[in-house]
């Protein structure tokens, strides 16, 4: 009982540290960006972004070094299902947008702005990353 | 999956939080299992069975 209670307390402690690191990164990053913009000091903007990245790195680092899983199994499953749903939506967008924009361009019906091609390219990159991640995970589990 | 977790917990006078602490998951996870909103992993099912000193199939009914 004490051991499992320790798991919960450790999980809470590390989650709190992760959130603090990320929260501090976001707040200080925004302050730096705002101060840099208002005072017209580029170094402050760069510093703000640096602090923000440090916060994100802190979040990931603390999660990585945590001696217990920072999410319990139900929370991990919620995360997996949400990620799966997100990928389904992105896949649907890619399936509809890529051929649709191609047809519009080829027929000359609409000159598709670069922005939309950029989005389709990004969706294609995400699809490739998902494929590679699936391949890697499949290998790990087989 | 149907289960008699609430009854077993009540018999012991345990709250959801007590049981959660005993098996190392969140109280919300115990609540979700009891309400048949989440099926526990095999590992957690074994931990729950051990906590109540019974077999998994005594506690969970897949039908």
What residues fall within each predicted segment?
Chain B
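Recognition helix of helix-turn-helix/homeodomain-like DNA-binding domains
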Residues: 25-38
């Amino acid at each position: 009982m004490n051991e499992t209670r320790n798991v919960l307390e450790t999980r809470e402690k590390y989650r709190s540290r992760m959130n603090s690191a990320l929260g501090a990164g976001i707040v200080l990053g925004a302050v730096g960006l705002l101060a840099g913009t208002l005072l017209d000091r580029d170094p402050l903007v760069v510093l703000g972004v640096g602090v923000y990245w440090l916060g994100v790195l802190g979040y990931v680092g603390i999660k990585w070094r945590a001696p217990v899983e920072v999410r319990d199994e139900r929370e991990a499953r919620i995360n997996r299902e949400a990620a799966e749903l997100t990928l389904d939506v992105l896949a649907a967008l890619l399936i509809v947008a890529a051929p649709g924009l191609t047809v519009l361009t080829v027929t000359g019906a609409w000159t598709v702005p670069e922005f939309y091609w950029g989005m389709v390219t990004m969706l294609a990159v995400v699809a490739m990353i998902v494929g590679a991640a699936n391949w890697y995970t499949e290998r790990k589990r087989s | 999956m149907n289960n008699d977790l609430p009854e077993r917990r009540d018999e012991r006078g345990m709250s959801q939080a007590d049981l959660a602490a005993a098996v190392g998951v969140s109280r919300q996870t115990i609540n979700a299992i009891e309400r048949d909103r989440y099926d526990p992993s095999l590992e957690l099912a074994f931990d729950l069975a051990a906590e109540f000193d019974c077999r998994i199939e005594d506690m969970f009914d897949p039908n």
